[in-house]
């Protein structure tokens, strides 16, 4: 039986609304084992601006990513990816986003 582990990824926004022209795409890997331990996101902290996209990649199968209820900015859309599938999320609200891998 796999231990249920919650990994946190804070997507802090320090810049004013950046607009699509300067938008960046940031890749976050979902791993069984990484530099900081087991069942992790790498990187585990990302600084992004509104308009940026975060691309979650399940390097090891069996992972997903989903926002944590109550841990995303007010007015931001919650998101949930399928197991073993990539998910791209465009950030439209400034704030901190908490995410987890369900298994």
List each language-model region with its residue ranges.
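Bacterial N-terminal signal peptides
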Residues: 9-16
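Bacterial N-terminal signal peptides that target proteins for export
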Residues: 1-9
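Extracytoplasmic copper-binding redox domains, predominantly the cupredoxin/blue-copper superfamily
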Residues: 19-103
């Amino acid at each position: 039986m796999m231990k249920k582990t919650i990994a946190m990824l804070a997507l802090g926004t320090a810049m004013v609304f950046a607009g699509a022209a300067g938008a960046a795409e940031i890749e976050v890997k979902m791993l069984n084992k990484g530099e900081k331990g087991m069942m992790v996101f790498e990187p585990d902290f990302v600084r992004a601006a509104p308009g940026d996209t975060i691309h979650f990649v399940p390097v090891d199968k069996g992972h997903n990513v989903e926002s944590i209820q109550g841990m995303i900015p007010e007015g931001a859309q919650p998101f949930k990816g399928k197991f073993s599938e990539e998910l791209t999320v465009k950030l439209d609200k400034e704030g901190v986003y908490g995410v987890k891998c369900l298994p």
